[in-house]
Amino acid sequence: MPAIHREFDRAMETVEAKPREAVSAASNILESIFKTYIEDNKLLMPDKQDLQPVFKIVRADLGLEPGSIEDQDLQRIISGLFSIVDGIGALRTHAGSAHSKGRKGYKLEPRHARLAVNAAHTVATFVVETWDKKVGYKPPPETPMPPSKRVAAWQVLDDETPF
């Protein structure tokens, strides 16, 4: 996962100055993970290789379809992942740097890009951890962040930031 975390760190570095690029990067990272999963597991790659179709193959193979999960609370959360993937793909299409904007531009703010990147990171982490569990991989324990480097969310936010 360190390589994936580095890619998301790079995406976060562009959030303020280039939010469109950050959204595109978040979508591209997810798409790469999903396509790698499909290839590594010798699954049939869908004809349309956008984010949604490749995620559909991955989630079915990992047993993440809502009907295959018994706990209703967990079903709700995992269904939320589907919405996140759909939203990130749509945001990339309508506001990302991957497509022209047409007549009407989308006013993408850094906070929107940050939401997309962080949400994509959550999806990526869950998918990779589920994949690891499926194959029986146990990653080495992570080195905890030293207390001097830890920052609470409230310390990062500007008091003027509207929610």
Identify the function of each model-found stretch:
Residues 80-136:
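Charge-enriched, short contiguous segments at helix-coil
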